[in-house]
Amino acid sequence: MKKVNLNEIKEDPWQSAGGKYVVSFKGISEALGREPASLDLSKRHPFDLEWSRMPAGKCNFPYHAHSAQWELYLVISGKGTVRHKDGRTEVVAGDAFIFGPNEPHQLINSGDEDLTYYVIADNPIGEAGYYPDSGKWKVNKSSAADRVVIKGEETDYFDGEE
């Protein structure tokens, strides 16, 4: 058995250059030995558990959808708004919600205090993401942080191949 305490895990801050997107993470699964870059599923773990904290008035990430990944959220404290394909839904402590592949989503801290939540994701190898607001695609290489972001036009499958 492996055990960690959330209070002993380093909090890693992240924010966009313009400061609209701000969130901090505690990688619980990584603290338990998960190796995100490994192709060995016994080292990757079948899912990833992360604690997140977002300041008031901020968003976690741009509105996006995953090609293959599932994400399950559990709100610990604070108040937020979840943007999704059917509109917006308010969430508070105790609320759980899930997004499957190709379901665009975004979390916004609409309260006056930090919004904290857990995220459980399956983080499949070869994951890609789509950003409907900007028309961009993100393709992960070895991890979500090691990525390529592209913006292009639709083309024929065999364009440039024959």
PLM region descriptions:
Residues L72, K79-T81, R88, P104, ...:
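Structural motif
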Residues A128-D133:
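Short, charged, solvent-exposed linker or helix-capping segments at domain edges/interfaces
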Residues E30-A37, E50-H66, P101:
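Conserved short histidine dyad/triad with adjacent acidic residue
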Residues D86-N102:
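Short acidic-glycine-tyrosine-enriched beta hairpin
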Residues P46, W51-P55, A65-H84, A121-P124:
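Short, conserved beta-strand element in jelly-roll/cupin
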